[in-house]
């Protein structure tokens, strides 16, 4: 496997998630400051706060008109930011999501697919399954898929007919056919990364080890880069589960994206841990980057 030179793009952050390459810049959410930040990947980072989401930002995406959608985790809303204005409510998902929202992908028609925790992760509550919620361009919403073990990072393949979601507590990437009407069907395992303990006890599941797939990015060869929320590395995975490459920056990595002018810059959201009580009042999170061989593809 190639020896990748890893550099720091941004430091002094609380906990970064939802990295996205859009219109020549890298956008990322900082959980505990509430900031959505845009940075340059070439030369100086030149960070700019483009929105603030007090109830904790996560997944990001863009509507066909160029306005930005931001997941607001704790109040279970999707917000919309138009032309640098204040965030406004695009969809309230509090009746559909049993606990905090997390990552999101937005398709070319402005439909958002949003994951959620399903249970109180940070308090160690019993594990519960959750669903993917589809938010249509007009803000209406419905559950699109159910019974997933912590649906999280999500990508849409270039043909716009396949959606793949990481089941963080299921040790797998799961694929669906994506219909013209936005429906998800034909659920199947895209890649099984590890066996997971058959338990509702979060501590027991974590102690058992294995891969916990989190945020991810698709490349032009159809492989997916996925962050392992338990082990720290970023894995390049082929459909069927073969691991093609592993990058270990020496700290935890919880999300990744491909971007840069040629689409070959792999950006990683890194921190010593994901525990809220360890991250909320510290500023140890990093945005890391390295160059890879195959450029980005699909969405986000």
Region locations from a protein language model:
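A short helix->beta-strand "capping" segment at the edge of beta-propeller domains
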Residues: 1-12, 187-188, 290-293, 300
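Beta-rich, blade/repeat-based domains predominating
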Residues: 9-23, 53-72, 95-112, 118-119, ...
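Short, solvent-exposed loop/turn segments at conserved positions within beta-propeller repeat blades
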Residues: 31-32, 73-74, 119-130, 168-170, ...
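A short loop-to-beta-strand structural motif that recurs across blades of beta-propeller domains
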Residues: 35-37, 77-79, 130-133, 172-174, ...
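Flexible "stalk/tail and boundary" regions
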Residues: 41, 48, 64, 81-84, ...
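Short loop/turn segments immediately following beta-strands, especially the blade-tip
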Residues: 41, 176-183, 292-297
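Beta-propeller fold detector
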Residues: 47-52, 88-92, 142-146, 184-194, ...
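Blade-level signature of beta-propeller repeat domains, shared across WD40, Kelch, NHL, RCC1
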Residues: 258-300
